[in-house]
Amino acid sequence: MAFQCLQTAIAQTSVTQDPGATPMTAAPTLRFSDFYLFPVGPLGLESSPALRQAAGKQVLLTGYMVQQENGSKPGQFFFTPRPVQMSEHADGDADDLPPATVLVKLAPDQAAWCIPHTRGLIQLQGTLSVGRQEAPDGRVTWVQLQLNPEATRGMNVFEFAGYLHTLQHSH
């Protein structure tokens, strides 16, 4: 996957590492704990009114970027309420993603960009979509966040060198 990233532009998400920091534009905060109704009933998980009302609107989410064994697919990554590491080679489709997982998508003109994993709690702002979406590989997501084009930027040469260094030392 690292070589594929070398062939495409590499994105550095310009996310806010400090959850107390004020975003540039005030979007309502949506918490992962507000995604579904609890307790879970006999019909399984049901989306909450707060999640349904946020559909199509700009929201601010605070959580963790999922660390994927093979790296995220270009132009997208998973975002969860807790740190998660996926081992696609060992687990296949039986991953440990929580129900409140968001598929984050870069702007369409950034769809070829690879996104390096960002550790720690981060905040993202974008337009929320709610509903079943199936990817070409068959993975189904129920909640998606479309980032605005200004949410990401290309890496400078020093950031890129640091990224390559971390790939050499990741375990």
Regions found by a protein language model. Give the residues of each.
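OB-fold and OB-like single-stranded nucleic-acid-recognition modules
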Residues: L6-H171
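N-terminal export leaders
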Residues: M1-F3
